[in-house]
Every structure is written in structure tokens, then in C-alpha cells.
UniProtKB/Swiss-Prot annotation:
It comes from Arabidopsis thaliana. GO terms for cellular component: nucleus. This is EID1-like F-box protein 3. Residues 29-81 form the F-box domain. PANTHER family: EID1-LIKE F-BOX PROTEIN 2-RELATED, EID1-LIKE F-BOX PROTEIN 3. InterPro entries: EID1-like. The gene is EDL3. GO terms for biological process: abscisic acid-activated signaling pathway; regulation of seed germination; response to abscisic acid; response to osmotic stress; response to salt stress; response to water deprivation; vegetative to reproductive phase transition of meristem.
Length: 272
């Protein structure tokens, strides 16, 4: 899946799945110039793995798409968030990751926007966009886990603030990712409660089916506190690959609260 951006070749509607061109099998014979994989890696290292350029390159042809899927998305993730990737992938950052490296890259850099769901009403959808900077923290992740699931590892972003269309309220859009979701206590709880997968909502990062944590009654009160939202003013989903996305109504902070707000410790997270 390609990431969205300002380039026309990667534009999409945020409520639709992004689709990569089907990658072709690359022959074993060597390639010269920009199609050489080592050359591509060196080029991206020289530009600090610029996400917009990578999106453009990956959309040029099936060959470039295949190289991006096999090498470039993973190298981008490792380069931009080494600690987070090490925690998510274990001892083998060169191996596979649930949902694929392209989905993790999109989650790192792209705010998916928001739209109305069963438990969260918006007068108009809010478009997704590239996030200039995102901070992911496993400390934040604990606030989104029920008490009996606190051993799970979940990296969460800070909410991305949007002005709600047609109103004065501020919309918060947030995202996160679990480590080894298939083995997690959170998934075990969902299965034990026989929570149904949503019919109309899909993961904006991998396109997988999702559970509503609100419908499953697995949203702890601490999640609203962490987001700066009122209780009941949020909804979030977790997909079968462990990607989390959600929306909330943000409570405006007074100037005194902003000045005295506690800064989170970044030692357990990654600024991307």
C-alpha cells in the first residue's frame, strides 16, 4: 500500500484502501543506475529517507514498487524509529512484521483523518494528511490497555488536532501499533468476548478488518484522560494485524494548564 501525500500519483480518499501495484518478480540479474537496489538505498540514506520521495519512487513502476516492499519501507522504519522497530520486531528487524513494513511506515507518517462511526458522530469527514512530526510512546500505550492486558506492548501516538468542520470543537485523531498482536492479551479478550469484526470500517494502514474497542467494552477510562478527552467522547479500533486508529473530542486546555502541563518522558518512545 502506498502512503498518501500531495503527489497526484499517491492521492486517495481516506476512507478507501490504498493499493500498491502488484509487484513483479525481480530477476536475479544485476541492474544498473537507479534500479540497482544498493544505489536506491544510498540515495535514500543521502536524503534521510524522505517519505515523500519514497512514495513517489514506489509509484513509478512495478519494479520500484517491489523494491520498496522488499527493502525500502523496512529500511525507512528502522532508520526513522530504530528503538520502536526493535521493540516491535524483536531480535530480527530484517524479518517480517504483522501487516507488512509498508503499513507500519504509513502508520508512522500518516494521520488517517476521521469519519462518523457507530459510536462517534462527525458532521463531515476530516481528511488524512502526512504528519510533520509524530511521537510514539509505549507509556502512552498503557493508558489504552484494560488492566488485564497491561503486559501487552502498544506504541501510541499523541493525538493529531483537527478543527471540526462546521463546529467549534477540536477533533483528535490518534494511531498506534501492538507488538505480536496475535499473541496479545487484548486479542485474547476480544476473542473470549466473541467481539464481532466491523462490517463497514477497515484499517486505514493495512486494509485489514477491525474490532471496535468501544463495542467490545474494552476502552479504559485512562484512555480519555491520556488524550485530554471527555469520557465517552472517543472511539478506536484495532485491526487483525494490531494497528490501532481512533478519534476523540479534545477538551480545550486553559493557558494555565498548558503552561503547567507535564512533559512526557521520550525515553520509551520515538519522535518521527
Amino acid at each position: 500500500m502506498l502512503l498518501e501525500g500531495r503527489f497526484s500519483v499517491v492521492q486517495m480518499n481516506t476512507n478507501r484502501r490504498l493499493k500498491f501495484n502488484q509487484p513483479s518478480r525481480l530477476p536475479n540479474s544485476g541492474k544498473s543506475g537507479i534500479e540497482n537496489e544498493r544505489v536506491l538505498v544510498l540515495v535514500f540514506e543521502s536524503i534521510s529517507w524522505d517519505i515523500h520521495t519514497l512514495c513517489t519512487i514506489a509509484s513509478l513502476s512495478r519494479r520500484f514498487c517491489a523494491i520498496a516492499r522488499r527493502i525500502l519501507w523496512r529500511r525507512l522504519c528502522v532508520n526513522r524509529a530504530p528503538g520502536m522497530v526493535a521493540a516491535l520486531s524483536g531480535e530480527d528487524p530484517s524479518g517480517r512484521i504483522d501487516g507488512g513494513w509498508h503499513a507500519l511506515a504509513k502508520l508512522m507518517f500518516f494521520c488517517g483523518g476521521g469519519e462518523s462511526t457507530r459510536y462517534f458522530n462527525l458532521s463531515q469527514p476530516t481528511s488524512g494528511h502526512f504528519a510533520c512530526e509524530s511521537r510514539f510512546s509505549k507509556t502512552s500505550g498503557r493508558f489504552f490497555l484494560p488492566k488485564n492486558c497491561r503486559r501487552d506492548l502498544l506504541y501510541m501516538s499523541d493525538p493529531c488536532e483537527h478543527q471540526a468542520v462546521g463546529g467549534d470543537e477540536h477533533l483528535g485523531v490518534f494511531r498506534g501499533v501492538f507488538r505480536e498482536f496475535m499473541r496479545s492479551k487484548t486479542r485474547e479478550c476480544l476473542v473470549r468476548r466473541q467481539a464481532a469484526l466491523e462490517e463497514k470500517v477497515r484499517c486505514p494502514y493495512c486494509g485489514g478488518r477491525v474490532w471496535s474497542m468501544t463495542a467490545a467494552r474494552l476502552v479504559p477510562k485512562s484512555a480519555a484522560r491520556r488524550l485530554g478527552s471527555r469520557e465517552g467522547g472517543l472511539e478506536f479500533f484495532v485491526c487483525v494485524n494490531g494497528h490501532l486508529h481512533g478519534t476523540c473530542w479534545l477538551i480545550p486546555l486553559s493557558s494555565e494548564e498548558e503552561d503547567n502541563g507535564e512533559d512526557d518522558d521520550n525515553s520509551d518512545g520515538s519522535v518521527i
